[in-house]
Amino acid sequence: MKTSSAKAKGRRFQQWVRDQLIEQLGVHPEDIESRSMGAGGEDLIMARAAREKFPYSIECKNQESLNVWKSSEQATENSGDYEPVVFIKRNNQKPLVIVDANYFIKLHEKDLKCDDGHT
């Protein structure tokens, strides 16, 4: 695949993630910006309104063959004070998300405590 085609494929997925977040978070489209391909840092730049609802640092990968460990490391390096999350996609497969296992379990523990009426 040509470099330009690969970048276009990545850009489409990055914009898809952006659009999904805008819709689900109910924020203004200008509150989440898609970073240009090849630029350093996290893939989605969020304004305060979006970050308050979704305190994560996003890395997007749309590749047929992917090193998840390198992708996770890249997301962590770019995450600053936010939890790193990697959105991954390949042809004819649904998108997936990679997060730290301990973080994911803690999220679930919070949900269980809320369901049980405990704080």
Language-model features: where?
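Catalytic phosphate/metal-binding cores of nucleic-acid and nucleotide-processing enzymes, i.e., regions
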Residues: M1-T119
